[in-house]
Amino acid sequence: MNPVAPTRKVKPPRNRPSDRRQARKKARIKTKGIYLRAIKDAFVKLNPKSAIKNPVMFVVWVATLVTLAVTINPDLFGPNQQKNPQLFNGLLTGILFFTVWFANFAEAVAEGRGKAQADTLRSTKSEAIAKQLSPDGTIAEVPSTNLKQGDTVYVVAGDIIPADGEVIMGVASVDESAITGESAPVLKESGSDVASSVTGGTRIISDELIVRVTSDPGKGFIDRMIALVEGAERSKTPNEVALTVLLAVLSLVFLFVIATLPAFAYYADTPVNVPTLIALLVALIPTTIGGLLSAIGIAGMDRVAQFNVIATSGRAVEVCGDINTLVLDKTGTITLGNRLAEEFIPINGYSVEQLASVAWAASVFDDTPEGKSIVRLAEKLGIRYDLDPNLAQAVEFSAKTRMSGTNLPGGREARKGAVGAIQGFVRSRNGQTIPELDAAYERVSQQGGTPLAVCLDNEIYGVIYLKDIVKSGIRERFDQLRRMGVRTIMLTGDNHITASVIAQEAGVDDFIAEATPEDKISVIQREQAQGKLVAMTGDGTNDAPALAQANVGVAMNTGTQAAKEAANMVDLDSDPTKLIDIVSIGKQLLITRGALTTFSIANDIAKYFAIIPVIFAAANLQSLNIMNLTSTNSAVLSALIYNALIIPALIPLALKGVQFRPLTANQLLQRNILIYGLGGVIAPFIAIKLIDILITLVGLA
């Protein structure tokens, strides 16, 4: 291939105060746009095809048409003895119309947030010109939409990466803020399972890369995310479907009750007209939760999206609320990751300098953070192995051998790795291990570090102490999960002693030491066999089977394509700890739905006492008029006005969610019954009475 001239480095722009003010202004404009679009969409949703999807609100929709007909012709269902029936029926029609419209508005606002996110993602796509590399090394400029899987492209500083792909040559900094919102550039390089993955629409800000395209047009990561976000409102979760069926059954029961009332009213010599019966029906059916149910589900996905996580469906978010077990990798989730060499511990009569020299040789080709830290620590001591890298051969780490190193000139072998693996290697070369190694191993392990043994041929020189730090506050977060009934299991490749020390410090419930990728699937299957729901995170190709097996699998955006496709959530920030937040959001979704359902049903009690006593006042039920409402008209209008206004009043709560507290199921139930059950009874009594007073003052009673 023709040589490419080096490019100058481009500094990423800094966030100035004016930039932040502009960002806040854009956020306000975006919110205003969401509400303006929702107002329009709420009218569009009045069409019968949309209305019938919500059985409860469809009843109100039909009731609105009936009262409209009665407003036009008050004697439609027989002679009407009511004073000024057209005014009353007209007011009734208007209130019912706005009840349906407010429910549509709540759903449209929730959907609008998803559409806004889809628009943001869509804006990252560009019709850029790509520099396509042909097999003979020549560069041809083609539209990015013409690229297909398997093509190779060349990108330099300032270019937009034209399609999803894998880096096959080069090292560069990439700005992924258009997707993740994180301004810090991300290093991309070839030869890494994770850092070699790039996303179309991101921008390269320094150096250059050669990328192999991994997706066809319209099937890239951003395309899939747009499809997921825009399709969020169309798929109901199983719990949402079950609750919808329950609300529909309750509505049918109340419809049957209302249908039988005229006969009882005739027997009691207290005739009831059709508009009043319709008002009673609407007041009794659970319109509050019926109007907010879709918004709650869609908002759950939106709250996850605000954490920069894309869920494949509402079901994935909801399942998070029922999670019993979290399977977590130690490195990067529980600890800070990037273990660094802290100390050389020589044994067997060797000096620190001799151990550092062999460790340097075993790590000179190791590009991992751990390997580079070993080289740095040795060079800090002024130690290097006398080695010509051109005459040496790298030995890559593998999960099977659990060690890596260098084949040196003259047939010598420098290795570093797990203590057990190095012991086996030395024995296979007719060497011997000594008790001093076990003492060094235990010393490092008891400090929560990772011991790496170092050998040259059949002689063990000592142990490298790799230091890892448990993230601050992680123990408190695990305590919160435990109070919610969620069990945590830590997986680590460390030995049993190190794993035990870190598990105790972090406060996890269980751990698996010296874990392999197969252990992830085994522990998930074991937990699922006990009837538990399991969540886990992963980023590598070897994590894909476990991500697919888990009930909730969260793939890192920096992970491989296989991991993203196997998971049902993708974290754009690639932060494994976010799984804990996602579980909390799932539980908040379920709690919000339960709380508003409780509030809605409790509301019916107050509305019952508002309307029934005044309708059947002649049947000696006036004593039940404990609110002392002025008249039948004022009672009906007051109850229905409250019934309509409570829906927009609760939209912020439905979108934001009920405040989440890490409590047990019984404690949550008691709290919700007290706040939303008792509150759902008391609030309507007060509100309906105040509305009745206002109606009386304006002369509509």
Curated annotation (Swiss-Prot):
Q: Does the keyword Metal-binding apply?
A: yes
- The membrane-spanning stretches of this chain are 57-77, 90-110, 241-261, 278-298, 599-619, 635-655, 681-701
Q: Which GO terms describe its molecular function?
A: ATP binding; ATP hydrolysis activity; magnesium ion binding; P-type potassium transmembrane transporter activity
User: How does the record say this protein sits in the membrane?
Assistant: Multi-pass membrane protein
HAMAP family noted in UniProt: KdpB
Assembly, in brief, is:
The system is composed of three essential subunits: KdpA, KdpB and KdpC.
Protein's UniProt keywords contain ATP-binding:
yes
Organism of this sequence: Nostoc sp. (strain PCC 7120 / SAG 25.82 / UTEX 2576)
Q: Where is the active site?
A: D329 (4-aspartylphosphate intermediate)
Q: Specify which residues bind Mg(2+) according to the UniProt entry for this protein.
A: D539, D543
Binding-site residues for ATP, renumbered to this chain:
D366, E370, F397, S398, A399, K400, T401, R402, M403, S404, K416
What are the subcellular locations of this protein? Cell inner membrane
Q: For this protein, what reaction is catalysed?
A: K(+)(out) + ATP + H2O = K(+)(in) + ADP + phosphate + H(+)
Q: Quick one: where's region Disordered?
A: 1-26
Keywords, in A-Z order: ATP-binding, Cell inner membrane, Cell membrane, Ion transport, Magnesium, Membrane, Metal-binding, Nucleotide-binding, Phosphoprotein, Potassium, Potassium transport, Translocase, Transmembrane, Transmembrane helix, Transport
Read off the InterPro entries from this record: ATPase_P-typ_cyto_dom_N, ATPase_P-typ_P_site, ATPase_P-typ_TM_dom_sf, ATPase_P-typ_transduc_dom_A_sf, HAD-like_sf, HAD_sf, P-type_ATPase_bsu_IA, P_typ_ATPase
Gene3D superfamilies with a match to the protein in the record: Calcium-transporting ATPase, cytoplasmic domain N, Calcium-transporting ATPase, cytoplasmic transduction domain A, HAD superfamily/HAD-like
Its Gene Ontology cellular component terms are: plasma membrane
Cystine links in this protein are none
Q: What is this protein called?
A: Potassium-transporting ATPase ATP-binding subunit 1
Q: Which domain of life is it from?
A: Bacteria
Q: What is the annotated role of this protein in its UniProt record?
A: Part of the high-affinity ATP-driven potassium transport (or Kdp) system, which catalyzes the hydrolysis of ATP coupled with the electrogenic transport of potassium into the cytoplasm. This subunit is responsible for energy coupling to the transport system and for the release of the potassium ions to the cytoplasm.
Identify the EC number(s): 7.2.2.6
- Describe the family membership recorded for this protein in Swiss-Prot or TrEMBL: Belongs to the cation transport ATPase (P-type) (TC 3.A.3) family. Type IA subfamily.
